[in-house]
């Protein structure tokens, strides 16, 4: 039962002048729980009813009579609703126990496709913490939309094309070793790439040699293509090892190269629609009517196509292939102008679905307040970071629970979960400063804190040998259990809000609040004592663990049963 809708229905029945949706938008959550669970301000009725809001509130209170409310009070211009704790706790616990991990599952998406462009590292470049944000935000959004009944397609749009491959081919032919590349693909390819960039300062002829090899690659030269494919395959194998560590997979690895033969169609379509203009020898699309000052550069004066041309081809291909309801691009804030241009050009081409393209931007990860940069050597690589997080998690588990049987597997779940959760708890439009010690802490607003709350509840349930029954009428009416019940009941709404705002941090913050509320309850309540409320308290514990586990799962974080 949705409290807000119930209250809106009650008020609409006695105030026909107000629509239910209007009332819903006016409902507020009181700052103090002693003031009720929800409040309706009557200011908007003063004009039509020609009375002071305080009088309106007093008169309306007397007309509301529903067993769903413990009491309804007029406090000044507000009508404060106190929900019936016993009745609602029984309903909520029954629903969670019955549905288990399917609690909060919805059919909003009706099976429609959502395409998510995420991660997208560059071939032959190391996978750093900077790449993590797009990867974990995109994966969490995929889980969230699936929970709401959408089908999702996760596309890893690899950076697998460009002039740097000419450089890489020259570098490999001069200094490369097949054995070394096979042993450590990313490290070795990066080493020779850095070397050739340094060498070109004193040997500019290497630059021309690299351009020549890239021309060969564009013209499907057999040797150039074979080397490019090998670099790509070796790099992808390395990336997939890291993705497996993170517990993340993809539906497509179609990267930049995939669209090489699809860009000319875009240029032709733009020409046919009369959208191309010449500017200093280049072909551009004017976007001033969309409030975009700079035109979209489609083709350079030398005939080379550009990044936006490739993205236009990708968007059109994805619409044709997946018929998406939404196409989400999880890409940093620095690309905001690019995606505005992309949407505007698609709109100019007459594609009504351009409105379904969504740039989900995010802030930077810094270290000690400094921007991370591969070129400057100020970079945090993901693989050693995961290893260190797992090591630190294992040390804490050794202290807390030295006899834990599968502690290495648990430490991996905690270490990886800590890194992902710390990223996802931050509002995505904000950046955060990388702090591994804070990430893996079992205290504070962290992934391990939430995981530990879940493991603690599982321990309680094992001790009690408790098996919840959906047919039982579990009821609670104390203040601390009520805070937990309200949070659990709000979980479905939280998921919808997270999807509407493309904001996984709402799920992470929810999980933190639920874990905190349960820990407070646990500190003040003897759950296992023999009392009339024992089974209801255990049912509440079970429901909390179920929802915590599901919230973590939406973020791509495991919830160990023991820690």
Curated annotation (Swiss-Prot):
Principal subcellular localisation of the protein: cytoplasm
Signal peptide positions (record): none
Top-level taxon in the UniProt lineage: Bacteria
A matching Pfam family: Arg_tRNA_synt_N
Entry annotated with the keyword Aminoacyl-tRNA synthetase: yes
Catalysed reactions, semicolon-separated: tRNA(Arg) + L-arginine + ATP = L-arginyl-tRNA(Arg) + AMP + diphosphate
Keywords noted in UniProt: Aminoacyl-tRNA synthetase, ATP-binding, Cytoplasm, Ligase, Nucleotide-binding, Protein biosynthesis
One cellular-component annotation, GO: cytoplasm
Stored SMART domains: Arg_tRNA_synt_N, DALR_1
Localization: Cytoplasm
InterPro entries in UniProt: Arg-tRNA-ligase, Arg-tRNA-synth_N, Arg-tRNA-synth_N_sf, ArgRS_core, DALR_anticod-bd, Rossmann-like_a/b/a_fold, tRNAsynth_Ia_anticodon-bd
Motif ('HIGH' region): 121-131
Claim: Ligase is one of the keywords in the record: yes
Matching NCBIfam families: argS (TIGR00456)
Complexes and interactors: Monomer.
PANTHER family found in the cross-reference section: ARGININE--TRNA LIGASE, CYTOPLASMIC, ARGINYL-TRNA SYNTHETASE
Membership in a protein family: Belongs to the class-I aminoacyl-tRNA synthetase family.
Name assigned to this protein: Arginine--tRNA ligase
Species: Streptococcus mutans serotype c (strain ATCC 700610 / UA159)
Biological classification of the source: Bacteria, Bacillati, Bacillota, Bacilli, Lactobacillales
């Amino acid at each position: 039962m949705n409290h807000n809708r119930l209250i809106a229905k009650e008020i609409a029945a006695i105030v026909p002048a107000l629509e239910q949706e209007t009332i819903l938008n006016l409902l507020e959550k009181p700052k103090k729980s002693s003031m009720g669970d929800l409040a309706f301000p009557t200011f908007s009725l003063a004009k039509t009813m020609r009375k002071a809001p305080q009088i309106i509130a007093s008169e309306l209170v007397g007309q509301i009579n529903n067993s769903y409310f413990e009491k309804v009070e007029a406090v000044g211009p507000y009508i404060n609703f106190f929900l019936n704790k016993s009745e609602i706790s029984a309903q909520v616990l029954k629903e969670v126990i019955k549905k288990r991990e399917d609690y909060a599952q919805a059919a909003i998406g009706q099976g429609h496709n959502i395409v998510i462009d995420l991660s997208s590292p560059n071939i032959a470049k190391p996978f750093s913490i900077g790449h993590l944000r797009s990867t974990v935000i995109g994966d969490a959004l995929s889980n969230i939309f699936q929970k709401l009944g959408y089908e999702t397609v996760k596309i890893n749009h690899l950076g697998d094309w460009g002039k740097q491959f000419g450089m890489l081919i020259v570098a490999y032919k001069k200094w490369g070793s097949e054995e070394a590349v096979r042993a450590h693909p990313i490290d070795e390819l990066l080493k020779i790439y850095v070397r050739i960039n340094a060498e070109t300062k004193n040997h500019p002829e290497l630059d021309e040699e690299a351009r020549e090899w890239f021309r060969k690659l564009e013209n499907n030269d057999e040797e150039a293509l074979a080397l490019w494919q090998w670099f790509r395959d070796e790099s992808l194998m390395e990336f997939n090892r890291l993705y497996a560590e993170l517990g993340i997979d993809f539906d497509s690895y179609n990267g930049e190269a995939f669209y090489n033969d699809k860009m000319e169609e875009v240029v032709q379509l733009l020409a046919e629609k009369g959208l191309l203009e010449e500017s200093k020898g280049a072909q551009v699309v004017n976007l001033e009517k969309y409030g975009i000052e700079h035109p979209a550069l489609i083709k350079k004066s030398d005939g080379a196509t550009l990044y936006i041309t490739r993205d236009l081809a990708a968007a059109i291909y994805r619409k044709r292939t997946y018929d998406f309801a939404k196409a989400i691009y999880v890409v940093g804030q620095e690309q905001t102008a690019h995606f505005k241009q992309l949407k505007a050009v698609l709109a100019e081409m007459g594609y009504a679905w351009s409105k379904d393209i969504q740039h989900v931007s995010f802030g930077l990860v810094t270290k000690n307040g400094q921007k991370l940069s591969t070129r400057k050597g100020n970079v945090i690589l993901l693989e050693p970071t995961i290893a260190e997080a797992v090591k630190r998690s294992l040390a804490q588990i050794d202290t807390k629970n030295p006899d834990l049987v599968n502690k290495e597997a648990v430490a991996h779940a905690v270490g990886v979960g800590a890194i992902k959760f710390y990223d996802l708890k931050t509002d995505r439009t904000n950046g955060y400063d990388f702090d591994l010690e804070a990430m893996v802490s079992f205290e504070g607003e962290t992934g391990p804190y939430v995981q530990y709350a879940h493991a603690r509840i599982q321990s309680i349930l094992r001790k009690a040998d408790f098996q919840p029954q959906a047919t039982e009428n579990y009821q609670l009416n104390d203040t601390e259990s009520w805070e937990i019940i309200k949070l659990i009941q709000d979980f479905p709404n939280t998921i919808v809000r997270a999807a509407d705002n493309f904001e996984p941090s709402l799920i992470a913050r929810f999980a933190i609040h639920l874990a905190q509320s349960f820990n407070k309850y646990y500190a003040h309540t003897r759950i296992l004592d023999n009392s009339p409320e024992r089974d209801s308290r255990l049912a509440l514990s079970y429901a909390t663990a179920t929802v915590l586990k599901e919230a973590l799962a939406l973020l791509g974080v495991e919830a160990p049963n023991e820690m």
